[in-house]
Amino acid sequence: MHIHDKDYYPTKSLTCVQHPLDVILNNGFTAGHGSSRPAKRIETAAVLACISLETCQNEMHGGQAIPAFDFYLAPYVRMSYQEEVKNLEKLTGEDLKDLYDAPIDDYEEKPLEGLQGKARLEQHAINKTVNRVHQAMEAFIHNMNTIHSRGGNQVVFSSINYGTDTSAEGRCIMREILQ
């Protein structure tokens, strides 16, 4: 008989967990002496995903996983897009509320040349959002590759599953994390 991770058995340390990232992002969480509020934008959601993995790795050994990374983060792409539209409202003085929930086929950075009016403003907001998602995914990868964990005495032993969300927002997460 083989007892997996027998050397950790006396410590009663837990091993391997999948993180309910949606609960953490929607409700915030407390770790040690600090706490966080719910995420409202993609940058915060990506950082909280990283902190969640790191915090658990410091308390247990074994792999840490986020089973539906793109699915959990997708709503924060839309929230960030809406924030960009609100910034444009402040800048232009125009009412752009109809763009908040307008259907978006894909979040792709495209040139603004030739676009006018709301189409130009919408694409500008999409471009800014794609850049924010890219930066958030890049930060997630850098953080996961450099954060040290006490429990595993290594960088966080982690995995993320993606390809679980086919929405425009989910595809944006996947595309940007793979770049």
Question: PLM ranges: what are they?
Answer:
Residues 1-179:
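Catalytic alpha/beta active-site cores
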